Each structure stands twice: as C-alpha cells, then as structure tokens.
Amino acid sequence: MSKKPTVLMILDGYGLNDKKEGNAVYLAKTPVMDKLMAEYPFVKGNASGLAVGLPDGQMGNSEVGHMNMGAGRIVYQELTRITKEIQDGDFFKNEALLAAMKNAKENNSAVHFMGLLSDGGVHSHNTHLYGLLEMAKREGVEKVYVHCFLDGRDTPPASGKEFVEALEAEMKKIGVGEIATVSGRYYAMDRDNRWDRVELAYNALTTGEGVKGTDAPAAVQASYDNDKTDEFVLPTVIEKDGQPTGVISDKDSVVFFNFRPDRAREITRAFCDDDFQGFERKARPHVTFVCFTDYDDTIQNKQVAFHKVQLHNTFGEYLAAHNMTQARIAETEKYAHVTFFFNGGVEEPNKGEDRILVKSPKVATYDLQPEMSAPQVCGKLVDAIKSDKYDVIVINFANPDMVGHTGVQEAAIKAVETVDECVGKAVEALKEVDGQMFICADHGNAEQLIDYETGAPWTAHTTNPVPFILVNADPKYTLRENGCLADIVPTLIQLMGMEQPAEMTGKSLLVEK
C-alpha cells in the first residue's frame, strides 16, 4: 500500500490583515493561495496572545508558534503560567514558596522578595510580587522586606518611581512588607560578568552598604535629579532610625521573583554558590534561596518554584510511537523551529524522523534576495511528497517572516509571491499521490510593514490572525472558526483516522458538513 502523505505547511510570518496599506500579503500576486482559499475549507486562526500561552494582546513568535503546534496543546510561557496560577490559587500551594515562608516562621527570621519591579513582562511582573506579598500575609510571616531592582529598559526610563509608589500602596492594602533597598538593573541584573556592578548590589542587600535614603520614592527621585534614571540607580539602602530596614541575614528566606534566567544568574550565584569566584563576599548569609524558575542547573543551594514544563507526547513522539515516518523540511533560518521547537524543546530526532536542511543564502539582509532558499526547499518538499517514504511532512517557508523583518515592501511582496509559486507546486505533487495538506502560519509579519499610527516602518511580528486551509482532504469536512495553533495537530490526527492522545488538549478543527 502506498503512503498518502499528510503535509503540515507553515508559511512563516504570513498573516491576514484587513488594511491594504503596507500589506505585502494583499499587494502580492497570489493566484494559488487565492484559489485555495476560495475552493477549499478556509478560516482565520489565532496565533498570538492567550491563544498561544502569551499574555493577552502580545504578538506571537516563531518559537512559541512551533511549540504550540507540535505539542497539540497551548504551552503557557512562564509569565502567563505564573499569572494564571495566582488567579487559580495554585500559586499559594507552591511547595518551594511555602518552604521559604515556613523557614522564616520557624526561625523567627525574615522573608526577602527581590526582583525587577516593573510590568515589562520580559524578566518579571510586579503582580507576581503582589502575589508573594499576599502569600506572606496568608502564611502569617511578619518580617517581609522587598528589594526593588528598577527597570527602565522594558518600561520607560523614569517610570520606576511610579512602580515603587504602586508597590507601597499594595503593601499597605495587603498589610505586610517594607521596601529595604532599591537598585538599578544595571547593577543587580548584569549578565556579562561585570562583577564590580553585581558586588555593589549584593553589598546593599547583605551588608546595608550603599547610598542611604529614608523613603524609597524619594530615593528614586533623588537619583533622577542626579541624572540617573531607573536602570542606573545606584544601590540604595532604605534606613529606619538610622539602621538599614532589612539586611539579608543568616536563616532568612530569599525569593527571587524574576522568571527569565539570563540576568538572574549572576547575583543568584553570589548568594548560592559555595565556590563563588566573582568577588570577595563581605557577607555570606546562609539562607533558604528560592528562584522563580531554574536559572541554571549548576547553581548550588537553591530551590526552584516553577520547574520547566516537560512536554510529553508531542506530535513527533506520537508518530514515532505508532511506527510512522516523518520528514521535517526547512532552510537554516527556520530549521530549529521545525525540529527542536516543534518537538517541545527536545534536540534529538524521533525514531523515523528525517530532517532535511537547505542552507539559507548568505546575504547581508534578506530584502537583497527575497526568494531566499524557497525554490530549493520546495524541490525537497515535492521529492518527499512523491517519495512514498513519509506518513507526515512538516515544512516551513521562511520568506514572509525573514523578509518582512526588513520592512522593505517590494522585497516582502516578492517573498510572498515566491512562496505562492511554491505552494502551487506542492499542491500539484500532493494531488498526484492523493495526499492531504493543512496550510497555516505561526504568526503574522509580512501583512503589516508600516506602523499605522506613525507611518514609520514596522518590522516586528503582529497580532493578526493567520490562514488555516485544508487542502485535498476528505470533502465531508469543513473547518470551524476561532481555532488556534494548538488545534492543528489534533486536526491532522483526526484526518489520519487516529486517536488523539490525552496529553494533547487542543481540539480538532474538523466539522462535518
């Protein structure tokens, strides 16, 4: 029996936008896609925000998109996951966080919360700190101190004072907590082994050395008056009655509420590593130290509140378990996406998984060669479809995204037209072997190349919907509206007449006519 391949085709960065201006997808000549949308089941799918496990309204990206697709479930990114746990109440049952509270109560010691105080959502979120304060109140911890690292990169450069004032209002409302120190992220969150900076922040936290102040908002204002905005605020110790409010000492608990690891590692090592080499520590308090996420396996003496979610039974694993063959095809720029990210962050290929890599062209920017390597990628796809070797083929065309990032409209139009031709060749090959295909995108990009408010070039991703098209499948099916990327693989599994595994919580898009 010959194999009838099922193809998942991802047009990277190919969104749908009602506006025509600066819309390369609309301005390009796309006879193939136009025909497919007219003749086959076609709906708009969601590829941004909560639909892909990101905060509401946040644009999607390729890593998140491919991970959601391959997992067949919404994969919550750390920010959303922690926020969701606070809302659901699971946060308040977290074992590592409860252990930090318990340690302080048993030793009549303090709990210190440190981290980036902003709503930037890149490294941390201030609502997560508010959740910790609420937890401390519920658990009856009395000595609670906050060490504020000020942002000014993922938020406006002089917004820190407002965040400090909002924190003070929140602590008053909850009924627990005092601000002990404020430091710019330049010092507390270095990631380039500039230990002299980290040392200043660490000393403020552990010895009470640094600039002195009696009121946190006033201390931040004084820094502004000195032409040092949030990021560069010198480590400042807030004093009460001439003494530091809350120095981190033996038997205390420390919770570092940043969830992104890269800028959290260095100061964490200063607290946790026995063989720390960064600088001579004036104080080495022995504390219960809890990191929000696992910043690094090699950091010693730490606990982790939110472990990385291991994804079991991704599409690749599922196919391998059913002794089915699969091909992953992409050019260099998107090769990791159809392999590592599609497999849930796992590098090793599955049994029966062939990986076909086409090199991306060596040009300074892709507007200089908007075709990129799409013709060669298409050739490999057609060969794979006709090879009688594969049950499933996952293919990515990088052009609309990579050329869209240049913001050059003519080039982006050419990129979209190139991909349209490739889709046409794939459909022809597919019909010859009576295969079926699902066409989608991982997020938008090429459909918006200008900022509609300012008229300036727009080179980022978008929150626009993406096309979902079902090609040459059983004609009794159409597609439902309001689907998301996590629903695609459950759709393919149903098309192949197989049983959806329990781990996949996405829902098939198929509807019988």
Give the positions of each predicted feature.
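Feature captures the catalytic ectodomains and active-site-proximal regions of enzymes
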Residues: M1-K513
